Structure formats: structure tokens, C-alpha cells
A protein has these predicted regions:
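Intrinsic-disorder/low-complexity accessory segments
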Residues: 20-137, 141-164, 212, 218, ...
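Carboxylate/His-rich catalytic cores and anion/metal-binding grooves
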Residues: 147-150, 162-190
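Aromatic- and acidic-residue-enriched carbohydrate-binding clefts of CAZyme catalytic domains
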Residues: 195-214
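Acidic, Ser/Thr-rich peripheral helices and adjacent loops at domain boundaries
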Residues: 188-194, 562-565
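Bacterial Sec-dependent N-terminal signal peptides
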Residues: 1-23
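Residues that line or immediately flank small-molecule/substrate-binding pockets and catalytic motifs
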Residues: 8, 247, 617
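Active-site-proximal loop/turn and secondary-structure-junction residues that shape catalytic pockets
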Residues: 171-173, 248-250, 327
Length: 632
């Protein structure tokens, strides 16, 4: 009995010891820290890794560091769906912080093949993005240590004269907070590492995704969510040389750093990118060796799909680096390698952060020169490419064309609208809803990645998707243009602020016989729901018909009457104007029911009823699919 009790006590104290770490467990030796900079514990009330930091606590600490240090500025870059702030620390020498605008302007010259820039004096920029997957929290918790170290370590003051660090502590604030709430709620002071523990089995939909249960690490290219648009804007403003992306993987694994599988690099990414990534990897290996952590590289993960945080930089002269840490999924969990503690996972991520800093410091000129050469080489590729531009559009739907143009603009790519209609190889592109993207611009490789149709590959296996031709995804007509056709086009450059969807309108007058709305527009379903919500009678044509002015209305056209709304002609008309404007669709007044094809009173006009939708969640429901339904 005494032996059993002793064994239980030893196990208890061993488990407790995993959680009893202080700042010295994480911080490297040989540094002295400015006492004016608050430690995480002084602000949060607990040591890093003792609890999972919530997003509000994370922001609170970042603000405290910025207020205490002349090396750090705090910036809110946007808001999530749940109105949490997306924040970023800019860390550099006070002299650099005083001339941020000039540093950004100089970096833009790296994209200009003809611009002169002094590489020897240019600071290197490193972006550090943590926990885009909210339930991979070692990254966000390591950002506490990174903020403290880079703000307080006295020995790096001189290094910051030549460096700018951009620290985004939580790329997915909503998901991170969801997960922190779960694991902190289920934490026991007497920790149990059994994988069956509730702490490690979070409730649906889990914290990986954002508010609408979307994987934000697949949104760097499509930029469909505010979190993505905000961070892509930061990327395009700064053009970082190194872009760190902190993740987690299965509990029984170790630690991964890029490069990934060599055969699965995207062909548009130059070989030099892989070579530099591998060179930086030697810094990670050395640092992880020093703390005795296991690791691997060049397996499992790849650098193909440009919509991920570690590959989006690769097509823009930057070095994207993925880190994958075996996940404790809570505070302490059994693994095939022994007990895996949350503090251990945080320490590995922070160590890789420090090794990246050292690589950036040592390779500053080399990486700035690489970016400059990257864009110089692009000009040679542009000159040899027979495709000088891409044109896309839809005669039936302004909205889809607009949304693709808007997407492309987010990536610092020039887009032009047409002044006149143009016909290319028998295909007409109308000036109202067509756009041209010239190839001869710095983002040539990214443009090519968006528009090309690639169907031959070195490897038959992929970590992610292998094709993403954007005009096809938007169901648009598109073509590549040669120089002769491009020179014939009359165009105007558009900007984020100048391009917008035109409001819809009602073409006709109050008191029309009926009103018609075509189903070809992207926002037609939105308008249809609003019409039924207003108690209007809505019918759908199952055969086409035509009016006296020769206009043909296809299958799927909606016919709209007052129904049971109780409105007079003018009030009914005014409501239609409101719905058309809000939904950006056009509604047409019809003067007679005697139409070509089927008449408006035909049995082929089927009545629609407003749908009452029940969305199933939890259980066996895929959260990605459910989230997509919620968003739409």
C-alpha cells in the first residue's frame, strides 16, 4: 500500500512539474532584459504556458509592451467578424520607427526592375504570423515571448538598426479565443494526460477556423474574409523578406520546418527560393539541437498552393517558412514520445522564432538582393511570354466580374476596365463588365498563377489543391491576349476605391402589368428572398418568353406581383426600387401578359414559396460546409 501511494505521489508531482515553468525555461542564455518592459506574467497574472492566453489578454500584453518600449509600435490592422481587433507590433530601432514611410517606399523599389536601391543599407523585414489555426495555440502563446524578447533584450538593440519585425500575435483571433476558452474550462490543476480527456476533445466546430468556420490558411489568395484582406494589405505594404507561419500537427510527431518536399515546389517559384529556405533551415536545426528537440524537414508538407501563409510569399520574392509543432492540444498530453507539455510546444516555436531572427540578421543583404533579382528576372519572362494580358468578363452578370477584379486588386496588381466593347476570337467582351490584367507588371508570376491552366506535375501527390484558375472558379469568359490585340484595347486603370458594383434599378414605371428579374445575376437569389420576405408574389418561368421590344427572358426568370403585400402601385414600385438597389440587380416592368413564347399567365410559370431553412450542425456535419452556408 505504501509503495502504491508513493508511486501515485511521484506521478502527481511529476505531472505538476510540467506546468511549473517560469520565463527562464523559454529565454535564451546570454541576454539581459530591460526591467522597464513588463513580462507576460506581470500583465497576465500567470506564466506563459500555465494557461492558454485568450485573445483579449494577448492584445492587452501587446499594448503594454508597445507603451513601455521605444522599439515597438502598436497598430490595429482591422477587425474580425466577431469585432475582435487584428493587431500588429512593428519592432525596430527608434530611428527606423521614425522613418517607417521611407522604409516602405524604398521596399517598393525592390519590385521595380528599373529603380535604383542601396541594398547594403536597406533593413530586412520579417513578418511573424502566429496561429492562423486557432486550435494550434503554441504559436500565439509564443508570440508573448517574442514580443518580450525583441522589446526587452538589450543585446539586440544594434541588430534592430538593420531589421524591421512585424509581429501579428494571432492571425485568427476568433478561433484562438474559442479554443482557449475550451481548454482553460476543461483544465484540471491535477493534469491528466490521457488523450481521452475532455480537454483534448474540443466541441464542434472546434477552434481551427474563423467565425464562419473557414480555414483562413487557405484564404491568402482568394481573400474572401476580412482577416485575410487585412493581413494581405499588410503584406503588400511591407513586402517582407521572410514570412513565418506557426502551426501545429499531430501529437505523436515532432517539429517540422521548411523546405517541404522538393518535388512539390510550384514551378513558378524559382529554385533560389528553395535554396535560401534550406539555408535558413540550418539555423533552425542548430537552435533545436541546442535545446535537445527532435525535428525534421523536406517531408510531408509542400510549397505548391499559393493560397497558404507559407507559400503566398514565395511567388513574390519573399521566403515563406512553415513551422509545424506536435500539438499538446491542451496543457499536457501523452504521446509516443512521452508526455508532451504545452510549455514545451511553446518553447520550440519561440526557439524557431529566434533562429529565424538570427538568419534574417546574417542574410539581410542576400535576401534583399534575392527580392530585387526576383523582380528583375520577371521582366525577362514577360518579354518571352506570348501572352501579354488576360481579359475576363460576363455579358450576363456584372457581379462575378466585379468580384474577381476586386480580388485581384487586393494583391497589388493593376487591373483595367474597357472603354469600348471588344471582340476576341469571336468572343465579345462588353465594357460594362469586362476587365484586362496586363502581364507586364511586377506581379507577373502571381497573375500567371491565377490565370494559367496547369495540368502536368512532377509529383502525383499534393498536400493541398493543385489547380485554382480563377476565371473558371468565377464561371467567367476569359482569354489570354497577344500584344497586337492588347494594343487595340482602349482601357482605364481602376483602383480599390474606384471600382464598385453599380446599384440595381427598376426599368419601367409604377403600375406595370408585372415585373421581371433575370436569374443570371450573382445576387439574384438575394433579391428573390427579399421579394418573398416582402410578401410579393414570385413566380419562375420554366420556359423562355419575349416582350414586344424584342427582349428575351430565359428560363429561371422571376415574375413579380404585389401578392399579399397590400401595397398600392407606387408603394410596390418603391419597394422594388429599394430591393433592386440593395441587391445590385435590375428589375424590368412588363406592360402586357401577351408575350412571345409562353404568356405570363401560363402554367409554365411556377409559384415560389419563401424557404424556411434549418441548418444542421454538430455530429457528422462538416463544419466547413455548414460555415459556408451560414456566410452565404
Amino acid at each position: 500500500m505504501k509503495k502504491t501511494l508513493l508511486s501515485l505521489l511521484l506521478t502527481f508531482f511529476a505531472l505538476c512539474s510540467y506546468a511549473q515553468v517560469d520565463l527562464s525555461y523559454y529565454l535564451p542564455s546570454g541576454y539581459t532584459y530591460d526591467e522597464a518592459i513588463p513580462t507576460p506574467k506581470e500583465i497576465l497574472g500567470y506564466e506563459v504556458g500555465e494557461w492558454h492566453v485568450s485573445h483579449d489578454q494577448l492584445v492587452m500584453y501587446m499594448k503594454a509592451v508597445a507603451e513601455a518600449s521605444d522599439r515597438v509600435t502598436f497598430e490595429e490592422t482591422g477587425r474580425t467578424y466577431e469585432k475582435r481587433p487584428q493587431v500588429m507590433l512593428t519592432i525596430s530601432s527608434p530611428a527606423n520607427l521614425a522613418k517607417i514611410g521611407q522604409i516602405k517606399a524604398d521596399r517598393k523599389k525592390l519590385r521595380d526592375a528599373g529603380a535604383s536601391v542601396d541594398i547594403a543599407k536597406m533593413p530586412i523585414v520579417m513578418f511573424m504570423g502566429y496561429s492562423v489555426h486557432g486550435n494550434e495555440p503554441s504559436g500565439a502563446n509564443a508570440s508573448l515571448l517574442a514580443a518580450y524578447h525583441f522589446a526587452a533584450a538589450k543585446e539586440i538593440a544594434g541588430d534592430l538598426d538593420n531589421m524591421v519585425l512585424l509581429l501579428d500575435p494571432a492571425i485568427n483571433p476568433d478561433g484562438l479565443n474559442r479554443f482557449a476558452s475550451w481548454v482553460n474550462t476543461h483544465k484540471s490543476y491535477n493534469m491528466n494526460g490521457d488523450p481521452n480527456n475532455a480537454e483534448f476533445n474540443e466541441a464542434w466546430p472546434r477552434g481551427r477556423t474563423n467565425h464562419y468556420w473557414f480555414d483562413l490558411n487557405r484564404d491568402w489568395l482568394p481573400v474572401q474574409h476580412p482577416e485575410s484582406r487585412n493581413r494581405v494589405r499588410v503584406f503588400q505594404e511591407w513586402l517582407p523578406n521572410i514570412h513565418l507561419d506557426f502551426h501545429e500537427m499531430g501529437t505523436n510527431s515532432s517539429f517540422f520546418f521548411q523546405p517541404g518536399v522538393p518535388a512539390r515546389n510550384h514551378p513558378l517559384t524559382p529554385l533560389k527560393n528553395y535554396e535560401l529556405t534550406k539555408k535558413i533551415g540550418t539555423y533552425h536545426a542548430k537552435a533545436l539541437d541546442q535545446i535537445g528537440s527532435m525535428y525534421y524537414s523536406e517531408e510531408d508538407f509542400d510549397d505548391y498552393y499559393y493560397g497558404k501563409g507559407s507559400t503566398y510569399p514565395d511567388v513574390q520574392g519573399s521566403i515563406g517558412i512553415l513551422f509545424e509543432q506536435a500539438s499538446s492540444r491542451g496543457h499536457l498530453q501523452e504521446s509516443v514520445n512521452g508526455m508532451l507539455s504545452f510549455p514545451f510546444t511553446i518553447r520550440n516555436q519561440f526557439t524557431a522564432n529566434l533562429s529565424s531572427f538570427q538568419a534574417a540578421k546574417d542574410m539581410r543583404q542576400e535576401l534583399n538582393q534575392f527580392m530585387k533579382d526576383f523582380y528583375k528576372d520577371i521582366q525577362k519572362e514577360v518579354d518571352s511570354d506570348v501572352n501579354k494580358a488576360y481579359i475576363f468578363g460576363s455579358k450576363e452578370d456584372d457581379a462575378r466580374s466585379y468580384h474577381l477584379a476586386d480580388l485581384i486588386l487586393q494583391h497589388d496588381i493593376k487591373v483595367f476596365s474597357l472603354n469600348d466593347d471588344i471582340t476576341v476570337n469571336g468572343k465579345e467582351f462588353q465594357k460594362e463588365n469586362s476587365y484586362i490584367v496586363p502581364a507586364d507588371q511586377p506581379q507577373y508570376r502571381l497573375i500567371k498563377a491565377m490565370f494559367e491552366t496547369r495540368n502536368t506535375f512532377k509529383d502525383s501527390l499534393f498536400y493541398d489543391i493543385s489547380a485554382w484558375t480563377y476565371p473558371m472558379a468565377f464561371n467567367l469568359d476569359y482569354m489570354a491576349l497577344n500584344s497586337q490585340i492588347l494594343n487595340l484595347a482602349s482601357v482605364n486603370e481602376i483602383t480599390k476605391s474606384s471600382v464598385d458594383l453599380a446599384p440595381g434599378k427598376v426599368i419601367g414605371t409604377a403600375g406595370a402589368y408585372q415585373y421581371a428579374m433575370e436569374w443570371t445575376d450573382y445576387y439574384a437569389p438575394k433579391a428573390a428572398y427579399k421579394l418573398m420576405e416582402a410578401d410579393f408574389q414570385v413566380r419562375v418561368a420554366t420556359n423562355e418568353f419575349s416582350t414586344a421590344d424584342g427582349k428575351v427572358y430565359g428560363r429561371g426568370t422571376l415574375l413579380i406581383g404585389k401578392g399579399e403585400s397590400g401595397l398600392d402601385d407606387q408603394a410596390f414600385f418603391n419597394k422594388l426600387v429599394e430591393i433592386a438597389k440593395e441587391s445590385t440587380v435590375d428589375i424590368y416592368g412588363l406592360t402586357s401578359g401577351y408575350t412571345g413564347g409562353v404568356n405570363l399567365g401560363s402554367p409554365n410559370m411556377m409559384h415560389l414559396e419563401k424557404p424556411e431553412i434549418a441548418l444542421l450542425v454538430e455530429g457528422g456535419v462538416d463544419s466547413y460546409e455548414a460555415g459556408e452556408m451560414c456566410l452565404n
